[in-house]
């Protein structure tokens, strides 16, 4: 029996056994988990019933509460009622996820510690399409975001998902699922405006072509207003983003469906390169310690370079850096980004209950990081087959195979400040064209072939065991096997205990593996020349290997209260850390957990919250670049049937933003967001929100050694107006 049939039977049972949910406790035979699921099902449109399960870590769809994993589900109301603009903002309400803002257009997301400020060590998919940028190992959250009207859910699976999802699903998986075109019929509009001029507008139109085929298209425009850095100077982070997309769904037969979809995104902003400590003067004859040339000048050291002759293209200083007072020198350049993709999917169910899907993806991504003179175009083609089948009432098998081809066209140039004669030891000559990043003749074409199998068995009515492995052969990593095992034990109809082990791998980014980095230039006072300093690419970098151990307990004391506890320990070998003078690898251990609750105190009051703790050790030393403790609390109170008072509180522990020369401490902070949401009609929603109300501003994050300092995350007031279908 598939999940749609199970949901329909559950609704039929409810209608026959009770008149309404006020008598839910009289539902004989339903556990508190099932009662809570029933309440949610009755609130859904009938067309959405087939899309309520979670894809899970077992390779087939099961109800959320049966998953032997730490899972958090974000739905559209979790975005709109909490005053979030983008999907990534809603991750702040997920225990264990650390979401920060740099300047106005930069969002950073870390899951369960140890991924650095920019590099993502969890896997993100949008309708099955991996969105990790392989060049730098990052995700552009603006480019990958989607209109709220087409969002069905975001499944946040904390913990390694190696045996199903494979490489890069190290600390977890974010699985974004959009709605079927049949569920987006008509017109939808969403407008958001902040008091500082930041704006977002979305339009979605859906229609029906025939009895069995549906379509939609959508448009989005986003404007960024200019903010300030923590020193008070302009952040130069204004700009814009534009997006468009479409989807076509057709029912080819009673058990055969076809989907064709695509999208385009463009963004135009500026980004900075910190030059404050890039020209160095040696303090000893062996060139082992240095100070910036600007400091050497103020100290009156001998044989200094002449700015007008030896580095005439270098920008002038504009004040001082913070907190270390070094003369501030920076260079802003354009950072255009364009991306487009197409997706086709054929799916069905055979007569012997084999549920299968065949998906194809094509993607073109073009970006220029003008501030470091690095640009690339990526073409990618993917083919993915997945299937699952119940072998018996107590035995379920999932399996799949996939292939990928990627090609890159990389171009590196010297940016304007660096165009002055410098000795390059790798060529033995003076050059004026040394780029910051040099991909050189490194490989530009990569193939990957993968397969997985997952076997889930009900050993008893209470115990479920699932074991599987992902097999991969790729040009980036060679051949790997990523095994995993999960079990769940139902004490009774209110308590589920689960555990898991996974061996997960993360591939180094192409910058880490293949790119030479010229990070500074040193003045040689004896010879009167600049000498380029660099660290070579690390083509011999191995994949990061992580053994993940997890335990969890899920308790639903009633249909109104869900409590979850998740504990984990990660043991990572060859974790990649970059910085002068080399790319280095370290052993990292991370231990932590999350405690969450979801409580419907009454028909008018809904509370959600969570606390997370995570402590990491790098080569035995405690890491300080990640907050050990974080907490969030969300409250939605219906003042009237159509008026909701929203309150969100977030606590984040202190941390230090690492840097090669200028570490920046970030104090712990408490954030309060308040909002009123009015729903004058069923499909209209008007919200007014105040965010970060406790402080006028605070810093959160920045790109290490690229940004000079973090931007201010300021108190903002937001007006949102939306009309649903």
Model feature map: region roles:
Residues 26-41, 46, 50-82, 108, ...:
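N-terminal periplasmic "start-of-domain" segments of outer-membrane beta-barrel proteins
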Residues 53-72, 88-130:
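Extracytoplasmic beta-strand/coil segments of soluble accessory domains associated
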Residues 130-158:
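Short acidic/polar hinge/loop motifs at secondary-structure boundaries
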Residues 163, 175, 182-184, 192, ...:
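Periplasmic-side early beta-strands and strand-to-turn transitions of outer-membrane beta-barrels
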Residues 206, 624-725:
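Conserved C-terminal beta-signal and adjacent last beta-strands/turns
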Residues 251-266, 310, 314-319, 330-477, ...:
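Face-selective signature of the C-terminal outer-membrane beta-barrel domain
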Residues 353-368, 490, 496-498, 533, ...:
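Membrane-embedded beta-barrel scaffold of Gram-negative outer-membrane proteins
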Residues 458-465, 563-573, 583-659, 694, ...:
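Gram-negative outer-membrane beta-barrel transporters
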């Amino acid at each position: 029996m598939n999940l749609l049939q199970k949901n329909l039977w559950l609704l039929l049972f409810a209608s026959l056994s009770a008149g309404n949910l006020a008598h839910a406790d009289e539902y004989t035979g339903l556990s508190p988990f099932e009662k809570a699921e029933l309440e949610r099902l009755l609130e859904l449109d009938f067309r959405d019933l087939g899309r309520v399960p979670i894809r899970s870590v077992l390779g087939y769809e099961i109800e959320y509460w049966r998953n032997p994993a730490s899972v958090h589900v974000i739905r559209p109301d979790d975005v709109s009622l909490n005053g979030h603009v983008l999907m990534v903002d809603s991750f702040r309400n997920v225990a264990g996820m650390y979401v920060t803002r740099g300047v106005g257009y930069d969002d950073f997301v870390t899951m369960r510690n140890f991924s650095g400020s920019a590099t993502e060590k969890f896997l993100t998919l949008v309708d099955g399409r991996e969105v990790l940028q392989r060049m730098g190992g990052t995700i552009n959250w603006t480019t990958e975001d989607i209109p709220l009207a087409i969002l069905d859910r975001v499944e946040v699976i904390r913990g390694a998902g190696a045996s199903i999802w494979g490489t890069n699903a190290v600390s977890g998986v974010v699985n974004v699922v959009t709605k079927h075109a049949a569920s987006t019929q008509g017109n939808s509009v969403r407008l958001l405006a902040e008091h500082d001029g930041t704006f977002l507008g979305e339009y979605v139109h859906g229609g029906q072509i025939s009895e069995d085929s549906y379509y939609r298209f959508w448009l989005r425009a986003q404007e960024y207003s200019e903010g300030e850095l923590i020193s008070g100077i302009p952040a130069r982070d204004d700009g814009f983003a534009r997006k468009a997309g479409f989807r076509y769904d057709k029912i080819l037969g009673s058990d055969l469906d076809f989907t064709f979809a695509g999208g385009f995104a463009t963004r135009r902003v500026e980004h900075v390169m910190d030059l404050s400590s890039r020209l160095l003067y040696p303090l000893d004859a062996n060139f082992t310690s240095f100070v910036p040339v600007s400091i050497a000048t103020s100290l009156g050291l001998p044989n200094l370079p002449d700015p007008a002759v030896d580095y005439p293209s270098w920008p002038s200083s504009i004040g001082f850096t913070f907190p270390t007072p070094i003369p501030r020198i920076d260079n802003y350049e354009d950072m255009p980004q364009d991306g487009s993709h197409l997706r086709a999917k054929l799916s069905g169910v055979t007569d012997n209950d084999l549920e299968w899907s065949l998906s194809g993806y094509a993607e073109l991504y073009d970006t220029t990081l003008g501030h470091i003179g690095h640009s690339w175009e990526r073409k990618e083609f993917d083919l993915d087959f997945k299937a699952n089948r119940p072998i018996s009432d107590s035995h379920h098998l999932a399996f799949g195979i996939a292939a990928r081809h990627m090609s890159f066209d990389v171009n590196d140039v010297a940016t304007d400040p660096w165009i002055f004669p410098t000795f390059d030891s790798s060529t033995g000559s003076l050059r004026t064209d040394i780029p910051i990043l040099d991909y050189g003749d490194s490989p530009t074409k990569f193939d990957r072939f993968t397969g997985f199998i997952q076997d889930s068995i009900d050993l008893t009515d209470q115990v479920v065991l699932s074991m599987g492995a992902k097999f991969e052969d790729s040009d980036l990593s060679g051949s790997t096997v990523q095994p995993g095992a999960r079990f769940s034990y139902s004490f009774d109809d209110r308590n589920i205990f689960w555990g898991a082990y996974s061996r997960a791998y993360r591939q180094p980014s192409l910058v880490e593996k293949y790119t030479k980095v010229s990070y500074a230039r040193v003045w040689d006072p004896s010879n009167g020349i600049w000498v380029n300093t660099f660290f070579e690419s690390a083509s011999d970098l191995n994949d990061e290997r992580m053994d993940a151990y997890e335990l969890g307990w899920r308790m639903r004391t009633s249909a109104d209260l869900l409590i979850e506890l998740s504990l984990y320990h990660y043991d990572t070998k060859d974790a990649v850390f970059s910085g002068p003078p080399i790319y280095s690898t370290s052993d990292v251990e991370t231990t932590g957990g999350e405690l969450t609750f979801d409580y419907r105190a009454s028909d008018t009051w809904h509370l959600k919250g969570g606390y997370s703790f995570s402590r990491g050790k790098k080569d035995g030393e405690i890491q300080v670049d990640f907050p050990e403790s974080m907490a969030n609390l969300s409250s939605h109170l219906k003042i009237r049937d159509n008026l909701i008072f929203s309150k969100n509180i977030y606590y984040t522990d202190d941390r230090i933003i690492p840097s090669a020369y200028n570490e920046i401490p970030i104090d712990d902070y408490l954030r309060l967001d308040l909002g009123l949401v009015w729903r004058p009609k069923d499909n209209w929603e008007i919200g007014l929100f105040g965010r970060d109300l406790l402080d006028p501003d605070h810093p959160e994050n920045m790109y290490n050694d690229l940004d000079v300092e973090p931007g201010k995350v300021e108190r903002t007031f937001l007006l949102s107006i939306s009309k649903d279908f």
